[in-house]
């Protein structure tokens, strides 16, 4: 697992006088932390993908960091899709996690100081840049739906506080009552993730197809990752970010229609 160290912080207050801080972390970084100065009324803003269709399989978000800077910020324009992680926090609570988007460096640095906008995407959005890799080099095997789901979440490298999964499907009423994880026994051939030219799907496409099959919506919201079943009224598994343990949460943990950041 990759380690990230904080390289920049951006503290600011909202219009409602709430204190927030943006932490920009660099993969493998162990140096000193510098404080940035925010620009404008909204140094950090979040936008969630909008879709009027209730059963959309994924709804991920983007964010923008606005700072007053000079040429030392050139390093933030990375070609690596998970090189700079961004955690947006209220107090000690992460309310958004993602990465600075890889893009070409185009800012004009002729002035001593300037306003700079840095574009970010939520952690799950970075799966667009990660191709599916088969389990073994020799041949394509069968893989469980649980392996696919957990692999995609872990590959996102997001600092999610928890992962919510609906307790919906089971082989039998007895298995449902016993909280058996049916996704562990549901398998699919890896061949489905490669086209006729053997080109792989990316992991964002994989999680999207998985959610279509299960009739779920995957959404990152207020620091956690949710797999929402719009028609579910029962319990949700609340997993730790590494899927090592879970607790139960009552139904209706999140309404897809009400997703927004204030």
Predicted regions, residues:
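Residue-level detector of short, conserved catalytic/binding motifs and their immediate flanks
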Residues: 63, 84, 98, 208, ...
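Charged- and aromatic-enriched interaction segments used to assemble
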Residues: 109-254, 258
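Short coil-to-beta transition motif at edge beta-strands of beta-rich domains
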Residues: 76-89
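Surface-exposed loop/turn motifs at beta-strand-loop junctions within extracellular Ig-like
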Residues: 90-92, 214
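Short beta-strand-centered aromatic/proline hotspots
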Residues: 96-105
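Juxtamembrane "anchor/assembly" segments of surface/extracellular structural proteins
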Residues: 1-79, 111-155, 261
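Residue-level signal for glycine
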Residues: 30, 92-94
């Amino acid at each position: 697992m990759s380690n990230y160290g904080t390289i920049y912080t951006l503290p600011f207050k909202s219009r409602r006088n709430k204190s927030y801080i943006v932490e920009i972390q660099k993969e493998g970084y162990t140096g000193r932390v510098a404080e940035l100065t925010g620009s404008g009324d909204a140094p950090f803003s979040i936008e969630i993908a909008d879709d009027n269709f209730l059963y959309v399989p994924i709804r991920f978000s983007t964010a923008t960091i606005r700072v007053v800077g000079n040429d030392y910020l050139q390093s933030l324009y990375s070609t690596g899709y998970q090189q700079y992680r961004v955690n947006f926090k209220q107090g000690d609570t992460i309310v958004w996690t993602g990465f600075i988007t890889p893009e070409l460096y185009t800012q004009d640095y002729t002035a001593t100081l300037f306003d700079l906008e840095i574009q970010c995407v939520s952690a799950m959005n970075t799966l667009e840049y990660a191709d599916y890799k088969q389990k073994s080099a020799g041949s394509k095997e069968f893989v469980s739906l649980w392996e696919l789901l957990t692999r995609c979440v872990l590959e996102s490298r997001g600092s999610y506080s928890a992962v919510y999964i609906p307790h919906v499907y089971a082989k039998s009423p007895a298995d449902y009552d016993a909280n058996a994880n049916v996704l562990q026994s549901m398998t699919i051939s890896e061949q489905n993730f490669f086209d006729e030219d053997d080109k792989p799907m990316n992991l964002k496409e994989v999680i999207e197809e998985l959610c279509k099959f299960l009739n779920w919506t995957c959404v990152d919201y207020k620091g956690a990752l949710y797999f929402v079943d719009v028609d579910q009224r029962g319990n949700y598994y609340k997993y730790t970010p590494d899927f090592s343990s879970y607790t139960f949460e009552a139904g209706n943990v999140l309404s897809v229609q009400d997703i927004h950041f204030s």
